[in-house]
UniProtKB/Swiss-Prot annotation:
Protein name: Cytochrome b
Sites where the protein binds heme b b562: H83, H182
Binding site for a ubiquinone: H201
Other noteworthy facts: Heme 1 (or BL or b562) is low-potential and absorbs at about 562 nm, and heme 2 (or BH or b566) is high-potential and absorbs at about 566 nm.
Length: 380
């Protein structure tokens, strides 16, 4: 009798993706983050669904409805904090996943990488709109500041902003449409993730050496299913430590004040996972220039495959490139710190230097380092 796992039309797809999938025998824990992102997405969709059952997207009642969820709904507080901190875990996994791709040269799978960049942008858009929904001070002013950036677009800017707002300021229409988009986008992300996986399985996974591993493959189950379960346990442990012990650690106290258009908070800043891009935006004195730098700080990832000059795929055996990579990581941490600081000396100049460094490392230093390493290979 043939195995149903291998013959049933639906089971066959699952089998070929998660059970009998040939995987390299030497992939490290850095390859766990793809499955962890899937878990994060499922968790966010489920908690978000239960929150949407009790949330009202009206400016008069949005803040109160979130308070109601935390106070009156059975386990509403844990669902709300799992959703809020789940977003943070999502972005930690995303940054690790992208970092892994950069370090080990996974960006040479062009289709997979480009879908990944689109996924990153979509997730950032979703998270931004979700932050607006509780309708606290930082929600309102964050929405105002970030949507207002579109007014920097020549000629159509102002019309575009008012079209997105649905009026002349961030108001009821804006909140309602942001809720609608925030609800639908995770399902689009899920669909894109499947396409991401489809393209990945066309080529098979990369591995730490960057050398083709066709000669040495092992089945995904049980080896990597067990490994992924370990990663999932650690992810859930970290999330629950955050949720149950310090649920507001990563939030902003200003968001516990209902939105007030007449009172601007002293420091408007987004959630921690956007601070690096926010720092780059603020570093440029010109509005349009800042917006372009902000967009390019993410879209530059799409250029990385074109900037690959090395004869080797992975950075595993390239010490100079490794140095550049870790300097880039340190630079991103610096930008994240600067994004949360007020706009005053010495933070302004540090932010400007870190922003220049960010683009300089990716566009100049990494290709140069690769070329030097290529020449060192010929050195006798």
């Amino acid at each position: 009798m043939t195995n149903i796992r291998k013959t049933h039309p639906l089971m066959k797809i699952v089998n070929n993706a998660f059970i009998d999938l040939p995987a390299p025998s030497n992939i490290s824990s850095w390859w766990n983050f793809g499955s962890l992102l899937g878990i994060c997405l499922i968790l966010q969709i489920l908690t978000g669904l239960f929150l949407a059952m009790h949330y009202t997207s009206d400016t008069a009642t949005a803040f109160s409805s979130v308070t109601h969820i935390c106070r009156d709904v059975n386990y509403g507080w844990i669902i709300r904090y799992m959703h809020a901190n789940g977003a943070s875990m999502f972005f930690i996994c995303l940054f690790m996943h992208v970092g892994r791709g950069l370090y080990y040269g996974s960006y040479t799978f062009l289709e997979t990488w480009n879908i990944g960049v689109i996924l990153l942008l979509t997730t950032m858009a979703t998270a931004f709109m979700g932050y607006v929904l509780p309708w606290g001070q930082m929600s309102f002013w964050g929405a105002t500041v970030i949507t207002n950036l579109l007014s920097a677009i020549p000629y159509i800017g102002t019309d575009l902003v008012e079209w997105i707002w649905g009026g002349f300021s961030v108001d009821k229409a804006t909140l309602t449409r942001f809720f609608a988009f925030h609800f639908i986008l995770p399902f689009i992300i899920a669909a894109l993730a499947l396409v991401h996986l489809l393209f990945l399985h066309e080529t098979g996974s990369n591995n730490p050496t960057g050398i083709p591993s066709d000669a040495d493959k092992i089945p995904f189950x049980p080896y990597y299913t067990i490994k992924d379960i370990l990663g999932a346990m650690l992810l859930i442990l970290t999330l629950m430590l955050l949720v149950l012990x310090t649920p507001d650690l990563l939030g902003d106290p200003d968001n516990y004040t209902p939105a007030n258009p007449l009172n601007t908070p002293p420091h408007i800043k987004p959630e921690w996972y956007f601070l690096f891009a926010y720092a780059i935006l603020r570093s440029i004195p010109n509005k349009l220039g800042g917006v372009l730098a902000l967009v390019l700080s993410i879209l530059i990832l799409a250029l990385v495959p074109l900037l690959h000059t090395s004869k080797q795929r992975s950075m595993m055996f390239r010490p100079i490139s490794q140095c550049m990579f870790w300097i880039l990581v340190a630079d991103l941490l610096t930008l994240t710190w600067i994004g949360g600081q007020p706009v005053e000396h010495p933070y302004i100049i540090i932010g400007q230097l870190a922003s220049i460094m960010y683009f300089f490392i990716i566009l100049v230093m990494m290709p140069v380092a690769s070329t030097i390493e290529n020449n060192l290979l010929k050195w006798k």
